[in-house]
Design a protein with these regions (language model features):
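N-terminal export leaders
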Residues: 1-6
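Active-site region of glycoside hydrolase catalytic domains
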Residues: 40, 147-262, 266-290, 307, ...
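An active-site-proximal structural segment forming one wall of the substrate-binding cleft
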Residues: 76-85, 103-129, 136-165, 184-195, ...
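Aromatic-rich peripheral "rim/lid" segments of glycoside hydrolase catalytic domains that contact
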Residues: 295-351
Length: 351
């Protein structure tokens, strides 16, 4: 493993950066003796300009063959015009690494295009490393790959504007439990900070970014440029009914979304808000949605979606819907149109 880490460091040192103006991300103070204002606190400032987002391109053929891409550059403009201001780019990078954990130059060029096109459309961008199952199943094998990824991506985007955020890993879960995740973060965060001292990082707790695990998340007290994320799929029996990968919900059908469910969502977000205030950390709700291939009436899914969106906004959480295309669909790429009941639940009036 030591040899692998040394090799990955050498790769990172040789990784070219993408040309951006130097006015992007500067060095920021880590003094925290007093609670800074939003204008001075980088993470809170980032959170204040993020409002409504959508997850994109995680399972798009784009990453293997740009000619087969479903998602096109014009979709960034459609997202912006639809009332959204940021995208969470879902990256499964490990399969695009060689034996020394070097990222495929073609894959990196595709990523460059995604970041460039999203930024040109006026969208903020979260780069989300999404190999969470591989990392959770084998944390020791994952760590050098994850370090190599952020060494290379960090060096490449060191001069990107501050509208580009780095999410270190999506949804860690057992056996990558709280103590192991905190330990990994203690090594991973310095890797990113070596090239991106002023970059906003997105980091969430274990158990699939479960809000109940927030108290156990250990972050460097001196690093105030971290946006803490959680994911919100409760009531799971409703949102994942009929989903074949969700064992406890795969066989369910006709599960309603109830007023009791609405009350639980509010209570859950009250807990997140209390944690945010107590720890002086801004919070992002990075995923929520309801599976659309289950036969669940779209009216029920839209009501769930509107409830979550409304409560998130009432609590001051920017949010990202899961997802633009595929099985929690927001935009029908084949028919080139929004799924309007879901879009209206997310953006009741155009921004």
């Amino acid at each position: 493993m030591l040899l692998k880490c040394l090799l990955s460091t050498a790769v990172a040192l040789a990784t070219p950066s993408v040309a951006y103006p130097r006015s992007g991300v500067g060095k920021l103070s880590t003094q925290t003796s007093e609670r800074p204002s939003i204008a001075a606190d980088p993470a809170w400032r980032t959170a204040s300009r993020l409002h409504r987002g959508v997850n994109i391109v995680g399972y798009d053929p784009l990453w293997d063959d740009a000619q087969k891409a479903r998602f096109k550059p014009r979709h960034f403009r459609i997202i912006k015009q639809g009332g959204f201001d940021f995208v969470r780019v879902v990256l499964q990078s490990f399969k695009h690494m060689d034996a020394e954990y070097r990222l495929d130059p073609k894959w990196l060029a595709t990523l460059d295009g995604v970041v460039k096109d999203a930024t040109a459309a006026g969208l903020s961008v979260i780069l989300d490393e999404h190999d969470f199952n591989l990392c959770s199943e084998a944390p020791d094998a994952c760590e050098p790959k994850l370090i190599a990824f952020w060494e290379q991506v960090g060096a490449r985007y060191r001069d990107a504007p501050d509208t580009v955020l780095f999410e270190l890993l999506n949804e860690p879960h057992a056996p990558l439990d709280g103590p192991r995740w905190n330990s990994m973060l203690s090594r991973l965060i310095p890797v990113v900070r070596a090239t991106n001292l002023g970059r906003t990082l997105v980091i969430g707790p274990t158990r699939w970014n479960n809000l109940d695990e927030l108290p156990g998340l250990e972050l460097p007290k001196s690093d105030r440029n971290i946006l803490v994320t959680f994911h919100s799929y409760e009531p799971f029996r409703f949102t994942h009914q009929g989903a074949p990968w969700a064992s406890e919900a795969a066989g369910l059908k006709d599960v309603p979304f109830t007023s009791a469910d609405e009350a639980r969502i509010k209570a859950d977000y009250d807990k997140v808000g209390a944690w945010s205030r107590a720890n002086d950390r801004p919070v992002l709700m990075g995923e929520f949605g309801a599976y659309e291939k289950s036969g669940t009436p779209i009216e029920a899914r839209a009501r769930y979606t509107a409830t979550v969106r409304r409560e998130a906004e009432a609590h001051g959480f920017p949010w990202a819907y899961w997802q633009f295309d595929s099985d929690f669909i927001l935009y029908d790429i084949d028919k080139d149109r929004w799924v309007e009941p879901i879009r209206k639940a997310l953006v009741p009036t155009r921004r």
